[in-house]
Amino acid sequence: MNNFILLYGEALDYPQQVSVDKKGKAYYKFNAAVERESGIIDILPIVVEEDTPAYNVLADIDEIGEIVGAQLLITGEIRTRNIKDKLDVSVRALSIKEDNDYKGITNQVIVTGYICKEVPIRTTPRGLLIADLVLAVNREDDSKLSDYIPSIMWNGTATRAKEKLRVGDCIE
């Protein structure tokens, strides 16, 4: 799999329809609060396609309880698209499970992609080195599309990325 994400977090709002594709299939978006190992909470946009297992689970949760506040285990893919010259990054949920007692891996991302541009390195005001990468991750469906996923590497990893990675290199 070229693009895999696993998240555990709390649904913050009710899914709202955000688009309909050419085939008439609707897409819904909601935000989830996902806690890092450090305790920092990230707010991530989750997109669910109509008539998928993930959508059906949300519909079931809505029937028997409240989606907002539900603890969800989400697996899916990172998706990107350009909207008015701004990169929109979201998680496309392939499966969702309500689980108030989940104790496994809570945040995991695995992507395999190609370096799109020369790796710039910069120093933060605190003196930390950062390399900003953009990976082109090919979708595994028949669309022949790619998602351009921004990634950050820190300190020694940033230095090695600058020294060793070239445009077109495939990394995981």
Named regions from a protein language model:
Residues 1-172:
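Single-stranded nucleic acid-binding surfaces, predominantly the OB-fold ssDNA-binding core
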